[in-house]
Swiss-Prot record:
The lineage of its organism: Viruses, Varidnaviria, Bamfordvirae, Nucleocytoviricota, Pokkesviricetes. GO terms for cellular component: virion component. Keywords: Early protein, Virion. Its main location: virion. It comes from the Viruses. Belongs to the asfivirus I73R family. Induction: Expressed in the early phase of the viral replicative cycle. This is Uncharacterized protein I73R.
């Protein structure tokens, strides 16, 4: 998958969900919504290389309920 497309998917996920997302949450959202399988570390490499996106993710170790349980 090309990098620009993956970056746009990450941006879309961050805009769609208002609550804090971790890199793992973002990967699950993209895999579920776009029906793709992402290689290990692909989301992390995108986030670490793009400081604008890295600032938006949750970097704490807080455990949030699964996405399908949360209410918007």
């Amino acid at each position: 998958m090309e990098t620009q497309k993956l970056i746009s998917m990450v941006k879309e996920a961050l805009e769609k969900y208002q609550y804090p997302l971790t890199a793992k949450n973002i990967k699950v959202v993209i895999q579920k919504e776009h029906n793709v399988i992402l290689p290990t570390g692909s989301i992390n490499s995108i986030l670490y290389s793009n400081s604008e996106l890295f600032e938006k993710i949750d970097k704490t170790n807080t455990i949030y309920p699964p996405l399908w349980i949360r209410k918007n």
